[in-house]
């Protein structure tokens, strides 16, 4: 049986671990490295599917935990799955719900069977097992699904992380056994291990032996420094098969996308661009711009003079500032559109730089313009 998700390697960058490729899904083939907008509740906040399509989004992420609680996976299944429910004709990826259980839910209790917790909406008692997570995701109907994992804090003790990694591996095997639709839904295993090299190696070895169609790198962007995250990626991505996609979960700042691509990551997602947009913070080629600040009240230039998105072609900083100060929803739509377009366009530039074998030069120029003032990474 052909796997639902396939990866085609097109080219490796000469000077780094970066790779240009294609993610092949039941709902289309998409170029990688790629950024995936997050639609937590089966909607990318304030934006229509047509707008996401127009700006070049290929795969959208939705959150299993939130959709399980509301409206419930059975309603989504009844609608014909997430693609029909939200009218998105391209790729959809769902997480397992594990991260939300560990970050949002109260009174959680982790056992070998799964996680007991209280619903953060109404306080009711809930239970999520590896099997239940897969059943929910099968019903939601995305192209790509995640195994249930525990995401331990980056600075947790070695002993705790060691036990957590072993349990996550057992949970991955249990989830794989009950996965109903491997022919049109690809299930990824999630590599954990915090900052411990030997535990990351063990986690990757366990999961690669199960032959998932793709692999996620979890437990990063959870409070550690950028240098620590890059260090973990340096020794983690080489552990994963070259013929499978690699997905770095929950990472969405411009510098982290470039540095992740340099280290061989193919897929990224994060709520960051839309979350900061709702606070009036915009990503531009010259760095972050807080457009609601008084300094922009009389500024009749675009958010970013190097951007050709709908927002920058049609509206000024002064107007967008006015909308946000007046609590007009249109302002949030404009900043959200711009930030997502900015990251999707950035990944297009990264792909071109890989093709041209000048990704380190691109990184240096981008970081100087953006204001990161960082040196080229030397160790891959």
Curated annotation (Swiss-Prot):
**Assembly and interaction partners:** Homodimer. Within each dimer, one monomer is responsible for RNA recognition and catalysis, while the other monomer binds to the replacement base PreQ1.
Residues of the active site: 95 (proton acceptor), 269 (nucleophile)
Residues annotated as binding substrate are 95-99, 149, 192, 219
* Name of the protein in question: Queuine tRNA-ribosyltransferase
Cross-referenced Pfam families, in alphabetical order? TGT
Which Enzyme Commission number(s) are listed?
2.4.2.29
The GO molecular function terms of this record are: metal ion binding; tRNA-guanosine(34) queuine transglycosylase activity
At which positions is Zn(2+) bound? 307, 309, 312, 338
Q: Which reaction does it catalyse?
A: 7-aminomethyl-7-carbaguanine + guanosine(34) in tRNA = 7-aminomethyl-7-carbaguanosine(34) in tRNA + guanine
């Amino acid at each position: 049986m052909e796997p639902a998700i396939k990866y085609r390697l097109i080219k490796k960058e000469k000077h780094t671990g970066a790779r240009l490729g294609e993610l092949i899904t039941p709902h289309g083939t998409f170029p990688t490295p790629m950024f995936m907008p997050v639609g937590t509740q089966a909607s990318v906040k304030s934006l229509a599917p047509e707008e996401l399509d127009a700006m070049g989004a290929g795969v959208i992420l939705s959150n299993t935990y939130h959709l399980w609680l509301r409206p419930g996976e059975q309603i989504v299944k009844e609608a014909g799955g997430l693609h029909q429910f939200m009218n998105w004709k391209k790729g959809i990826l769902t997480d397992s719900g594990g991260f939300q259980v560990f970050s949002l839910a109260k009174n959680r209790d982790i056992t070998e069977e799964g996680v007991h917790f209280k619903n953060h909406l109404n306080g009711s008692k809930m239970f999520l097992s590896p099997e239940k997570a897969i059943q929910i995701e099968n019903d939601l109907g995305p192209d790509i699904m995640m195994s249930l994992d525990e995401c331990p804090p980056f600075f947790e003790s070695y002993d705790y992380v060691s036990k957590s990694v072993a349990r996550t591996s057992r949970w991955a095997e249990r989830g794989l056994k009950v996965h109903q639709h491997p022919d049109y839904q690809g299930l990824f295993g999630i590599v954990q291990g915090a900052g411990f090299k030997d535990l990351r190696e063990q986690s990757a070895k366990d999961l690669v032996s199960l032959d998932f169609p793709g692999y996620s790198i979890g437990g990063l962007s959870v409070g550690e420094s950028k240098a620590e995250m890059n260090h973990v990626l340096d020794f983690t991505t080489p552990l994963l098969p070259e013929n499978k996609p690699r997905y770095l979960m929950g990472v969405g700042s411009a510098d982290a996308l470039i540095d992740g691509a340099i280290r061989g990551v193919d897929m990224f997602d994060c709520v960051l661009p839309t979350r900061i947009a709702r606070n009036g913070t915009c990503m531009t080629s010259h760095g972050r711009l807080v457009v609601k600040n008084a300094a922009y009240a009389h500024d009749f230039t675009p958010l970013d003079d190097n951007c050709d998105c709908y927002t920058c072609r049609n509206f000024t900083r002064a107007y967008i500032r006015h909308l946000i100060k007046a609590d007009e929803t249109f302002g949030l739509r404009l900043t959200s559109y711009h930030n997502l377009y900015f990251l999707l366009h950035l990944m297009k530039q990264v792909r071109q730089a890989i093709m041209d074998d000048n990704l380190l030069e691109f990184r240096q120029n981008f970081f100087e313009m953006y204001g990161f003032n960082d040196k080229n990474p030397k160790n891959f």
